[in-house]
């Protein structure tokens, strides 16, 4: 089957936003106007095409990123709809990793909200070009220019309108195109009849002012345009569009559009902007990776002629076809029935069938080409972030960063029959979602699940019940603490046992130093002269990793520590891997006496919105919860307070805020970083954990 759309005519985009900005409705309208669906599904009625899981339709939020393919103006647009709720951050991260561009949807009344900041920061990390769609222009309190100002103030983004709204709230009736300098007036409810007219006289001055600002902002990113602009020459519409495209693709400029997806206004113009300003796979730098045989860096340009290379970015269990692996093809061509090499795992995989996805319906295809996003059936060993490549041209692409879980719950099956089913269900859910961890407490035999927030675990327990028919009792949420060292030290681990026959002997000297935050555990072998034989070095590292999993203070995993093995000794007969593993763990225990071990707790960035008169209460809440205020701003009659507060202090806060503000206050929290707990709290945690032992 020949390629239907050239690479130049392919767009891989994500739709990202804060929860409730109207992102899923926007995607629905895109599917409607591109001819994928013939009746529009409203999210608040629970009928949305992209939100196909039962929980999504009940809760009206998007949990998994559904991928779909649509066509617009002779282009193929692959769309990934991502969740806006902070508990599902990994879904956003893995989507951004495989996208070339994104549409950031804002609620025009609120502008940039906490989760918008999170997804924006993630998109910046991955270098993803973006356009901004200020949605809900029909909503009471909608304010387009306020939304634009929040892009500058809260995100420091070089964002400028390429459109202006005509009217707002109930009176929102059209859009001014600042490039063509024409007005697009909507004359029917479905948004399919659009009249192009001259700009109404009362909007002309504003339109000219913002066109001038737009030209100036774009000219600043392009020397040739800047020269023309300074010399007073006219910049043509074509030059302006080309300048916007170039600056957007270079992530130097963010065009801002407006509309109301719910009222069917502005979505087609936004689709035009996706084609005009977001990159094709050819416009972005070629993907880099490491050749596992030579350790050399290699690139894979976007081309069907190059060897096949793809990244698996999502695993899903489908009730009809079983395990689905979503992947993005960066180079080459793949046919169903062929074999690929999973270079991350070193395993050969057979591609059974290839499916092009549309939310939860699917179309079987024979071939995928570079730049495509598709799903494969039949992969057994592949997990999120794995590289799939041609067996003769190996490459390991950069994987997906997985954030550490911050909250945990104990789950126990209600009956013996549920016991076996629960193990299978949890394993399948963990395969789909790398931020969901399942562990068994060795001493008590309890199953502990960890995730990114209460809603995250709630949804997973719910899925366990519905999809796998497992009934379970769930404990109260607990905070996922971590441990680390705050000082450097050197410590010996010496293990010797002699009891008839072959003995055990292991002797190591290890230097422990604090590592940078987020860098995890790093092991360095600095042995010279073979005082610890090479075959025992991995055992030393393994012994440390296993011991660090249970910490040195209160049984929590240790993070951000460097360990340098620099000396030791061995016995020709009695030394073994086991002996060196034990010696390494004894060295860690010894180090704990002088390395100032500390317990770390997750700190949340909490954004609280309350009426002016409740500001004092909120400041009191933050202080009482060991928090610190980071900033405040007024928005209408409300105050928005941003603060860093330990997660441990936030359980039950929704009820406290509700009663303090008579139900008018709201808050959002997102994990920000780990921080040392105060000494008094640390002692309490240690006592509590020792008591449980």
Curated annotation (Swiss-Prot):
Q: Which keywords does the record carry? A: Cytoplasm, Elongation factor, GTP-binding, Nucleotide-binding, Protein biosynthesis
Q: Which residues form the tr-type G domain?
A: 8-282
Give the record's GO CC terms.
Answer: cytoplasm
- Where are the disulfide bridges? none
> Where is the protein situated, by its record's location annotation?
Cytoplasm
Q: Which domain of life is it from?
A: Bacteria
Share an example GO biological-process annotation for this protein: ribosome disassembly
Q: Does the keyword Nucleotide-binding apply?
A: yes
List residues binding GTP.
17-24, 81-85, 135-138
Record bears the keyword Transferase: no
Output the Gene Ontology terms for molecular function. Answer: GTP binding; GTPase activity; translation elongation factor activity
UniProt family annotation: Belongs to the TRAFAC class translation factor GTPase superfamily. Classic translation factor GTPase family. EF-G/EF-2 subfamily.
Function text: Catalyzes the GTP-dependent ribosomal translocation step during translation elongation. During this step, the ribosome changes from the pre-translocational (PRE) to the post-translocational (POST) state as the newly formed A-site-bound peptidyl-tRNA and P-site-bound deacylated tRNA move to the P and E sites, respectively. Catalyzes the coordinated movement of the two tRNA molecules, the mRNA and conformational changes in the ribosome.
Any idea what this protein is called? Elongation factor G
Source organism (scientific name): Streptococcus pneumoniae serotype 4 (strain ATCC BAA-334 / TIGR4)
- What lineage is this protein's organism placed in? Bacteria, Bacillati, Bacillota, Bacilli, Lactobacillales
């Amino acid at each position: 089957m020949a390629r239907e759309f050239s690479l130049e005519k392919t767009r891989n985009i994500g739709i990202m936003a804060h929860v409730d900005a109207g992102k899923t409705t926007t995607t629905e309208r895109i599917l409607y106007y591109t001819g994928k669906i013939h009746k529009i599904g409203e999210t608040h009625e629970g009928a949305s095409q992209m939100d196909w899981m039962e929980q999504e339709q009940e809760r009206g939020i998007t949990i998994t990123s559904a991928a779909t393919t649509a066509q617009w103006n002779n282009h193929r647009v692959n769309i990934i709809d991502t969740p806006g709720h902070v508990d599902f951050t990994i879904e956003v991260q893995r989507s951004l990793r495989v996208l070339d561009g994104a549409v950031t949807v804002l609620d025009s009344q609120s502008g940039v909200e906490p989760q918008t900041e999170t997804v924006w920061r993630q998109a910046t990390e991955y270098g993803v070009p973006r356009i901004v769609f200020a949605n809900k222009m029909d909503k009471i309190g909608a304010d387009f220019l306020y939304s634009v100002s929040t892009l500058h103030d809260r995100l420091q983004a070089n964002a400028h309108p390429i459109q202006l709204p005509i009217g707002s709230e109930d009176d929102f009736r059209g859009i001014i195109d600042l490039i063509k300098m024409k007005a697009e007036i909507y004359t029917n409810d479905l948004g399919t009849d659009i009249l192009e007219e001259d700009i109404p006289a009362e909007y002309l001055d504003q339109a000219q002012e913002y066109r001038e600002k737009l030209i100036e902002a774009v000219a600043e990113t392009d020397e040739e345009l800047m020269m023309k602009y300074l010399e007073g020459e006219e910049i043509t519409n074509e030059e302006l569009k080309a300048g916007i495209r170039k600056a957007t693709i270079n992530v130097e400029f963010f065009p801002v559009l407006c509309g109301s997806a719910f009222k069917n206004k502005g979505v087609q113009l936004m689709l035009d902007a996706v084609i005009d300003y977001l990159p094709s796979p050819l416009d972005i730098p070629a993907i880099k990776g490491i050749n596992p045989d030579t350790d050399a860096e290699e690139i894979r340009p976007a081309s069907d002629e190059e060897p096949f290379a793809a990244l698996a970015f999502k695993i899903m269990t489908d009730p009809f076809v079983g395990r689905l692996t979503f992947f993005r093809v960066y180079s080459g061509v793949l046919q169903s029935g062929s074999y690929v090499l999973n270079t991350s795992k070193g395993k050969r995989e057979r591609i059974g069938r290839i499916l092009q996805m549309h939310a939860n319906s699917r179309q079987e295809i024979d071939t995928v080409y570079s730049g495509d996003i598709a799903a494969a059936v039949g992969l057994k060993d592949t997990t999120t972030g794995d590289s799939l490549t041609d067996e003769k041209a190996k490459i390991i692409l950069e994987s997906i960063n997985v954030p550490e879980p911050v909250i945990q719950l104990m789950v126990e099956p209600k009956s013996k029959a549920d016991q076996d089913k629960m193990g299978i269900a949890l394993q399948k859910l963990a395969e789909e979602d790398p931020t969901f961890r399942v562990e068994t407490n060795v001493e008590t035999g309890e199953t502990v699940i960890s995730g990114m927030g209460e809603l995250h675990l709630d949804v997973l327990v719910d899925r366990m019940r519905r999809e796998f028919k497992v009934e379970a009792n769930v404990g109260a949420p607990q905070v996922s603490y971590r441990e680390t060292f705050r000082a450097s030290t050197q410590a010996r681990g010496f293990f010797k046992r002699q009891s008839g026959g072959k003995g055990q002997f292991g002797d190591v000297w290890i230097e422990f130093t604090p590592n940078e935050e987020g860098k995890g555990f790093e092991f360095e072998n600095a042995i010279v002269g073979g005082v610890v034989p090479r075959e025992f070095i991995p055992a030393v590292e393994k012994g440390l990793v296993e011991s660090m999993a249970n910490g040195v203070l209160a049984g929590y995993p240790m993070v951000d520590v460097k360990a340098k093995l620099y000396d030791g000794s061995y016995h020709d007969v009695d030394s073994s891997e086991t002996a060196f593993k034990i010696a390494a763990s004894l060295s860690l225990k010894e180090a704990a006496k002088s390395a100032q071990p500390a317990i770390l707790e997750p700190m949340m960035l909490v954004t609280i919105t309350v009426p002016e008169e409740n500001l004092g209460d909120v400041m009191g809440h933050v202080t009482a919860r060991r928090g610190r205020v980071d900033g405040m701003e007024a928005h209408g009659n409300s105050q928005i307070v941003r603060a860093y507060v330990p997660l441990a202090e936030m359980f039950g806060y929704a009820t406290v805020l509700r009663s303090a503000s008579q139900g008018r206050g709201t808050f959002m929290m997102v994990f920000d970083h780990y921080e040392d707990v105060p000494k008094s709290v640390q002692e309490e945690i240690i006592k509590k954990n020792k008591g449980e032992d």
